[in-house]
Amino acid sequence: MKKADNEHLARMRVEYGSVEKDGSADLDVDWLADGWVALLRRWLADAEAAGIAEPNAIVLGTVDAGGRPVTRTVLCKSVDDTGITFFTNYGSAKGEDLASTPYASATFPWFALGRQVHVRGPVTKVSAEETADYWSKRPRGSQLGAWASQQSRPIASRAELLDQLAEVTERFADHDTVPVPPDWGGYRITAEVVEFWQGRESRVHNRIRVHDGRIERLQP
């Protein structure tokens, strides 16, 4: 990369406003009067209303067996008082990471709104019943895709992957419902720490953290 390119990157920044686009005031501890779940759901609804693509997308952080951090984007499919839930192949790279170190972080990045929410804590698999309930809501094509893909494993070509999809499509052609793969299911990140972030002028951002029942403001 040329020096001029780096200089351009160094100058790139967005100046956040002093109020939200909906006219609301600065994020403060009283916004969490009804708990962190209520505020997270409100911000999710705001992101959806703003037309943000996949507003429930989270950047999921894990560490591998060697202690090296890895991130990727997945979709949050449930929020409740215990934490947030996502679903995946248990044999995937993230599944292997969580088997060796069952702890993760997740960030909802709503850049267009100048907002982020960060959740971290221990991770456990959800029950088979909870997995089956979510699985039943997935489109059939997504169900077949989960059977066809040995997630995170190398494959010679896309054509080979499509051949695998065609094979499972034929296998389940006479089935009214597609069963849950044995190596597929949900994980719940128990919300040990939740932080709400709101961009503000001159990088003097608002940060409110919920931890061990305490709600506290953090310096930016």
From Swiss-Prot:
GO terms for biological process: pyridoxine biosynthetic process. One of its GO terms (molecular function) is FMN binding. Pathway: Cofactor metabolism; pyridoxal 5'-phosphate salvage; pyridoxal 5'-phosphate from pyridoxamine 5'-phosphate: step 1/1; Cofactor metabolism; pyridoxal 5'-phosphate salvage; pyridoxal 5'-phosphate from pyridoxine 5'-phosphate: step 1/1. It holds the Pfam family PNPOx_N. Its EC number is 1.4.3.5. Binds 1 FMN per subunit. FMN binds at R72, T73, V74, L75, C76, K77, F87, T88, K94, Q116, Q151, S152, W197, R207. The keyword tRNA-binding does not apply. Its cofactor is FMN. It catalyses: pyridoxamine 5'-phosphate + O2 + H2O = pyridoxal 5'-phosphate + H2O2 + NH4(+); pyridoxine 5'-phosphate + O2 = pyridoxal 5'-phosphate + H2O2. Substrate binds at R13, V14, E15, Y16, K77, Y134, R138, S142, R203, V204, H205. It comes from the Bacteria. Belongs to the pyridoxamine 5'-phosphate oxidase family. Catalyzes the oxidation of either pyridoxine 5'-phosphate (PNP) or pyridoxamine 5'-phosphate (PMP) into pyridoxal 5'-phosphate (PLP). Homodimer. This is Pyridoxine/pyridoxamine 5'-phosphate oxidase. It comes from Mycobacterium sp. (strain KMS).
